[in-house]
Amino acid sequence: MAATRCWRFVLRSPGLSLHTAAEATVTAPEVTGSDVKAAPVARYPPIVASLTADSKAARQRRVERWQATVHAAKSVDEKLRILTKMQFMKYVVYPQTFALNADRWYQSFTKTVFLSGLPPPQAQPDREPAQVVDLAALRAAVCDCLLQEHFFLRRKKRAPIYQERYAVASPFLDQLVPSLTGLLSAYNPVLAAAALDCNRPVHFYWLRGEEIIPGGHRKGRVDAVRYQINDKPHNQIRISRQLPEFVPLDYSVPVEVPVKNCKPDKLPLFKRQYENAIFIGTKTADPLCYGHTQFHLLPDKLKRERLLKQNCADQIEVIFRANAIASLFAWTGAQAMYQGFWSEADVTRPFVSQGVITDGKYFSFFCYQLNTLALTAQADQNNPRKNICWGTQSMPLYETIEDNDVKGFNDDVLLQLVHFLLNRPEEDKAQLLVN
C-alpha cells in the first residue's frame, strides 16, 4: 500500500510582508547624528588575492608588492638593484643601425616625438656668442685638427677594411672636442669643471608595452616588453648641474608619437637575456651626474657613399635621427633614474641633453628633453607627456682637403658647435647677468 501523505499547515508569524517591508524602508525617516552607532571594526584581515595564484588579481598584487619594495628603497643604488635584478628576455636596441626607417620605431619604443630644427634660443647675455668668441681662433684650431689627421700625420700601416674613414675621424674627434672645450672654457666656466669621457659605456633598461608569451613554461601569460640600450659615445661632457629646459614639462606637442602595431622583431630586433644595466658613464656618487653634450661617430658601414651606392639616399638622415633618439634617450633616462625617478615615480622636472652625430665630415645636431619615464602599460594609460627630440639635417664641415689647405670650411657648423658648448645651467646665467 502506498503511504499516506500528511500535510501540516504552519501559521504565519505576525509581521510585515516583503512588499510592505520594502515600502516601510523607503518611507522610513533617515537617522543621523548621535542616533547612529559606530560600525564595529572588522576583526578579520582583509581578503586579498594569493601571491602564488595564476590569476589577474594575484599578478596585480605581486606587481604592487614589488613596486612598494622599490618605493621603500633607501638609496638610489638599492633602487637600481631592485629594478634591474630580474633577468628576462629583452629586446636589444642598437643606436647605430642599418634597419630601414629605424627612427620611427625608436620613437615608438621611447615615446619620443621628433621636431625638425633646433629649439628656440634661450635668454642670452647682451651680446651674441659669435660676437664674444674669437671665431678665427676656433676656426684655426679646427683646421689644425683636420690637417693633423689628413695631411701632417703619415700613417705607414693601412687601416683595416671598413675602417678607413673611422681610423682618421676618430683621432680627429678626440682632438676636436678637447680643443674647443679648452678654448671656450674662458667664456663658459662650466666647461672648466666638467668631465670629458672618451668611449665610456652608457646603458639603459626600461619597459614599454605588453605581450603574450608565446612559448616556454610561462606560455600564455601577459608580460611587459623589455628593452635594453648599450651605447658607447665617442665623447661626452658631464657637468654638476642640470641644463635649462627647452620647453615646459607639460608642453603640449602637436605631433603624435608613431604607433607600431607589429612586434619589434620586424625591425628587426632580437631578444637576449643578460644582465640589466642602467649607467650614465659614472657611478651614482659622482657629483658630475648631469649630461651636457654627447659626440657620436658613425662607422664606415653606415657612411654616406655606401648608402648612395645601395640606392638608400632616403636613409642617410634616418641613421642620424635614430642614433640621436636612442642615445640621448638612454643618457637622459639614466640621469633621471640616478635622481630617484622611475616609471611609477615620474620625473618632476625635465632632463635635457645635447648630441652631435658625425661621420668625420658631416655633422648633425640634436637636442633631447626627457619629460616622462612612465612608459609601462599601466603608467602610460593617462600620461599626456611626450619626450621631445629636435634635430637638424647633416651639414658638411668642409668640402675637401688639398695639400695643406682646408677648402670650403663651413662656419655654420662651427657656430652651432659653439652654441652647444656655451650652453650652461640657469644659475650660471643668472650670476653672469648680475656681474
UniProtKB/Swiss-Prot annotation:
Q: Which GO terms describe its cellular component?
A: mitochondrial inner membrane; mitochondrial large ribosomal subunit
Gene transcribed to yield this protein: MRPS30
Q: Where in the cell is it found?
A: Mitochondrion
Where on the tree of life does the source sit, at the highest rank?
Answer: Eukaryota
Q: How does it assemble?
A: Component of the mitochondrial ribosome small subunit (28S) which comprises a 12S rRNA and about 30 distinct proteins.
Q: Which organism is it from?
A: Bos taurus (Bovine)
* Name of this chain's protein: Large ribosomal subunit protein mL65
User: GO molecular function terms here?
Assistant: structural constituent of ribosome
Its chief place of residence is mitochondrion
Name the InterPro entries for this protein. Answer: Ribosomal_mL37/mL65, Ribosomal_mL65
